[in-house]
Amino acid sequence: MSYKKDIQLEAAEKIAIDFLAKTKDLYKKYLLAGSVRRREPIVHDIDLAVVPKGENFAAWEEKATKRVNGIGGRVASFGETITSFRYRGVQVNLFLCLNEDAWGVTQMWATGPKGHTIGMTIKARERGLIINSRGLWTREEPPKLIRTKTEKDVGRILGWKYKPPEARGKRGKA
């Protein structure tokens, strides 16, 4: 179930900062992503790219649920790569990076927008690679993860000029 609603960018930033202040110890790394990072004036939800702390994902999931419940939020859904919470009336999506060598892809995937993500997928296919929310992969068997520490790494590997988040999805702006 989606809890998306329209809110002003400034209000979304305040909610995101508050959420992060109360949950940041759950992550090794985190980045405010999505439409907030792209500086969209109207935001429908809050997206965060995160590397969960700890080796045991099930234990992390339990700890995250308790924390969010404890700060007045609630779990909307847990998935393999995206977890959603409802917090202060807004949907907060965590894009989970379960391998730090895929951090660059997770940042790009979480920041979007959808057209940018589709473009990455096309570029990867043209280069004989696979890209998804888990990382950038070779097509050999078994597939090998290609290390992407930054979004610029992803662009370099795909032969795609890096666009800052606020320019993504906007024609004629670079």
Label each region the model flagged.
Residues 3-11, 56-174:
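Acidic, metal-coordinating catalytic segment for phosphate/diphosphate chemistry
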